[in-house]
Amino acid sequence: MYSNVIGTVTSGKRKVYLLSLLLIGFWDCVTCHGSPVDICTAKPRDIPMNPMCIYRSPEKKATEDEGSEQKIPEATNRRVWELSKANSRFATTFYQHLADSKNDNDNIFLSPLSISTAFAMTKLGACNDTLQQLMEVFKFDTISEKTSDQIHFFFAKLNCRLYRKANKSSKLVSANRLFGDKSLTFNETYQDISELVYGAKLQPLDFKENAEQSRAAINKWVSNKTEGRITDVIPSEAINELTVLVLVNTIYFKGLWKSKFSPENTRKELFYKADGESCSASMMYQEGKFRYRRVAEGTQVLELPFKGDDITMVLILPKPEKSLAKVEKELTPEVLQEWLDELEEMMLVVHMPRFRIEDGFSLKEQLQDMGLVDLFSPEKSKLPGIVAEGRDDLYVSDAFHKAFLEVNEEGSEAAASTAVVIAGRSLNPNRVTFKANRPFLVFIREVPLNTIIFMGRVANPCVK
């Protein structure tokens, strides 16, 4: 069911680009940007956020965990909690589609939260079937109507929870920007909500006359926001005279392990890839107390906290006889939550490879397979809420995502010297051992809200 007031203008179709960019090395404080009203403390009545169109599912979809009494964390808004769970549902579904398109020996890394944020900014201007498909694919239709109607407000609250953290040892920062063609007038409501909720200011560029210079300007902005780690995210010739708008979301994370690995204990060991081949990886080692559990069919789950404890890395390692691909297919938000709930602190021997993953891909094919079809179609797309006067000739020509992850003994790629004393390798046969010498899944999550910020697969840590 839709509620909208729009005008339709027919002309040559113009392109909208979405870029969901992410850098993670391993995490200051980002405030909600540029408004006299503090979105982080505001209530819904304080800031009206009414997009052009609202979609309500005729029948609210039941979710697998509906009816279960999963406890909402203290000082957490119920609507923010719902949104976080919706993002987790999208994360696991999208990952499975992406994994199906990859070779088992390929590394994968992405930020589902970054992707959801970029498309939430697009949802602001969407109507009709385009809006419905956005709601369904990103699982926004699984949350209550009250949350759905004000989803951008609660996205702001979620961002405040995630990014407004004072922690000198860790850093989690998000930056958004709209790059629009300077010849066009953009919808004022779209601009206001984008800036207030997502901190996405509009920067005019000359796509018509200077497409290549515009591409270079956007890539430079991304490079600056990711400390030079992500460059040339927009490929050559991706921007032309028909481009109207480029939406960019970046997330940067850098953190130090709560319990660091000693470089003196790192040594070369074999890592066994999915195809049966092996490679020589730098295997880190430490003994300590960590949250751990051996779950269904011998799969091991380990949680490694970063300093501050709010953000952790979760590793999922199948037993040697079970392929990671099978675990990937079976994984749901409910299964993952069940495993996390079962974790218990115990003494553990941890062997983990040092690795670096860079991953970049178009989101278009996977999202189309998931049902987001109209948004990418020049004939069907309905995005009247972006350009002034209800102009309805826009579509998304492509959406790009790029990610970077580096893990080492300190946690981050910029390792500092440390005076922490860590025991060397021992031969205690009674200790439980977690040895990641074969493909494993990796999640980086914000613990209180259980928000999946990053996720991926380490299939080959030997790639340079």
Curated annotation (Swiss-Prot):
Result for mutant: residue 397 to P: In AT3D; type-I
* Flavoprotein is among the record's keywords: no
Q: Name the consequence of residue 179 to L.
A: In AT3D; type-I
Outcome following mutation: residue 424 to D: In AT3D; type-II; Stockholm
Tell me the impact of changing residue 439 to L. Answer: In AT3D; type-II; Utah; deprived of inhibitory activity
Result when mutating residue 131 to V? In AT3D; uncertain significance; type-II; Southport
State how changing residue 437 to K affects the protein, per the record. In AT3D; type-II; La Rochelle
Reported effect, residue 283 to V? In AT3D; type-II
Q: What is the effect of changing residue 456 to R?
A: In AT3D; type-I; severely decreased antithrombin activity
Effect in UniProt of substituting residue 152 to Y: In AT3D; type-I
Family matches, as CDD domains: serpinC1_AT3 (cd02045)
The main place the protein resides is secreted
**Modified residues annotated as Phosphoserine in this record:** 68
- Outcome of mutating residue 79 to H: In AT3D; type-II; Rouen-1/Padua-1/Bligny/Budapest-2; lack of heparin-binding properties
Consequence of changing residue 214 to F: In AT3D; type-I
Q: Report the outcome of residue 32 to R.
A: In AT3D; type-I
Residues glycosylated per entry: 128, 167, 187, 224
So what does mutating residue 219 to K actually do?
A: In AT3D; type-II; Glasgow-3
Which tissue types show expression of this protein? Found in plasma.
Medical condition linked: Antithrombin III deficiency: An important risk factor for hereditary thrombophilia, a hemostatic disorder characterized by a tendency to recurrent thrombosis. Antithrombin-III deficiency is classified into 4 types. Type I: characterized by a 50% decrease in antigenic and functional levels. Type II: has defects affecting the thrombin-binding domain. Type III: alteration of the heparin-binding domain. Plasma AT-III antigen levels are normal in type II and III. Type IV: consists of miscellaneous group of unclassifiable mutations.
Which function does this protein serve? Answer: Most important serine protease inhibitor in plasma that regulates the blood coagulation cascade. AT-III inhibits thrombin, matriptase-3/TMPRSS7, as well as factors IXa, Xa and XIa. Its inhibitory activity is greatly enhanced in the presence of heparin.
As for family, the record states: Belongs to the serpin family.
Q: How does it assemble?
A: Forms protease inhibiting heterodimer with TMPRSS7.
For this entry, the protein name equals Antithrombin-III
